[in-house]
């Protein structure tokens, strides 16, 4: 993280996550469920699906151009039920909420630049990978560091673990009184840039008003806190060397109660959890969201490619931390700029590193789509792929098989510098 270079030797850093039942995450998953269905039937679908939820209402809007025909309403209701909203008494349920659609086709002005990039339109290149132009202008970041085995910052990694565990114990019935909505937050104490202690763990989780015969709210909250410590937190730290201690603050439902939640408690919108989706604030963000967007949208595909580059650099031992920025112009295939920053942790010259990356990684939209197989994954995975990364983070997911998490370029990177010893930094 760039900012950490100027901080004192001892500091706290905090990241948060949310469960799949958080209103914004409900929207992300609905948008990506639609994307999965369309790409499964027509891999060339152009999709920009935005979802809004509120009490008793689901609205899907945006622009879609596809040869596929899908039952939007049925897909939406199935996803809402899968998340866990099946009780109309909670103000939002799969079978009783209104579902509204307001969908247009992709603008022809945008489409012409995506279908035929500037390089093709102006006969600047006959390379097949120069055919597809970026779906929009913008800047995207990818990041990796060696704080965890999955090469992610520790705060967001732990926040995701805890959020995912909340869902697991709810769905399994182990803590049947939990409801779908929830948020987690973890503060880590760093010394000299390395995590040394778990300072604070915060969990806000929606729950039934009563737990069995426990009706007093103070007693309900006490039970929730005890259960979460034993069943959720304890499990999440079982295989991690850095564990909570008696000095770790453990905060649960600090408002005192969390019965009303989900879309009844807060309106939700696709693309409002972009920091949760990425690196928890540990790295910079270009501002573009992922969910509901087909792979021609570089907000999504280029962010995946940038993570792929950064992770392979760190996995190859060429840096302890690495951030990759890439930027695009709409309708142009080749990136406007590419930047690699190792924040003083690099073991090789950064200019040489950039040369090696540009020679071995594909950063044109068509090349990213091809190398990471982004159009075909939904069909190859039984009709669902993007909806599964829409909650609990798009990066560092050891529970999913994600092409941008592969470290298959490590040997190529090592070989490039093994043959160029003068590139090694001193």
From Swiss-Prot:
Residues 106-116 are annotated as: Flexible loop. Its EC number is 2.5.1.6. Gene3D superfamilies: 3.30.300.10. One of its GO terms (biological process) is S-adenosylmethionine biosynthetic process. It is an enzyme of class 2 (transferase). It catalyses: L-methionine + ATP + H2O = S-adenosyl-L-methionine + phosphate + diphosphate. Keywords: ATP-binding, Cytoplasm, Magnesium, Metal-binding, Nucleotide-binding, One-carbon metabolism, Potassium, Transferase. GO terms for molecular function: ATP binding; magnesium ion binding; methionine adenosyltransferase activity. GO terms for cellular component: cytosol. Binds 2 divalent ions per subunit. Binds 1 potassium ion per subunit. It comes from the Bacteria. Homotetramer; dimer of dimers. Belongs to the AdoMet synthase family. This is S-adenosylmethionine synthase. The gene is metK.
